[in-house]
C-alpha cells in the first residue's frame, strides 16, 4: 500500500468514527491541537517518532498527554493505534487529509493561492470572491508566499493549477521561443 492511500485510509477511518457522534469539527480541533503539540515540541516529537523507544513507553506518553489536555476517547484511541502501528510520524499528513474530508463534507473547496508578497485583506477578499464565483462553490483559501514567482498569483485546487505569475509567463515565453528555434 502506498503512503498516500495509507494516510487517506487513516483519515477516512477517523472521520467516519467522528461522524457517528456528529463531532467531526471537535475531532479536527483535537487532532490539530495534538499535532501542533507534537510538531512544536522537539523532545515529544523525537520520543514518539524514534524507532528505538519502546512502544509501551510511547503508549504511556500518549495516555498521559491525552489525560493532561483532556481529549476525546476517539482521538486518544486513534493516537494509540498510530503508535501501535508505528505510524505516528504521518500524523501531520493525516490531519491534512482529515481537513480535506471535513471541508468536502461541508461542500467547501480548499484552494491554495500563492503570491510573491503578502496580500492585503482587501486583495484576499477580492481573490476569494472571484474564485468562489468561478467555482460556484464556497472555498477555504490558504494564502502562501513564494517570492520566486516574482509577481502575480498561482491558484491550486484539486488537480488544477492556474498560473498567473510573472515566472509562469516567462516560462511560457521561453518555451514558445524554443519551439521556433530562437536562441534564448
Curated annotation (Swiss-Prot):
The keyword Cell membrane applies. It is found in: Cell inner membrane. It is a peripheral membrane protein. GO terms for molecular function: proton-transporting ATP synthase activity, rotational mechanism. GO terms for cellular component: plasma membrane; proton-transporting ATP synthase complex. Coiled coil: none annotated. Keywords: ATP synthesis, Cell inner membrane, Cell membrane, CF(1), Hydrogen ion transport, Ion transport, Membrane, Transport. HAMAP family: ATP_synth_delta_bact. Belongs to the ATPase delta chain family. F(1)F(0) ATP synthase produces ATP from ADP in the presence of a proton or sodium gradient. F-type ATPases consist of two structural domains, F(1) containing the extramembraneous catalytic core and F(0) containing the membrane proton channel, linked together by a central stalk and a peripheral stalk. During catalysis, ATP synthesis in the catalytic domain of F(1) is coupled via a rotary mechanism of the central stalk subunits to proton translocation. This protein is part of the stalk that links CF(0) to CF(1). It either transmits conformational changes from CF(0) to CF(1) or is implicated in proton conduction. F-type ATPases have 2 components, F(1) - the catalytic core - and F(0) - the membrane proton channel. F(1) has five subunits: alpha(3), beta(3), gamma(1), delta(1), epsilon(1). F(0) has three main subunits: a(1), b(2) and c(10-14). The alpha and beta chains form an alternating ring which encloses part of the gamma chain. F(1) is attached to F(0) by a central stalk formed by the gamma and epsilon chains, while a peripheral stalk is formed by the delta and b chains. This is ATP synthase subunit delta. The gene is atpH.
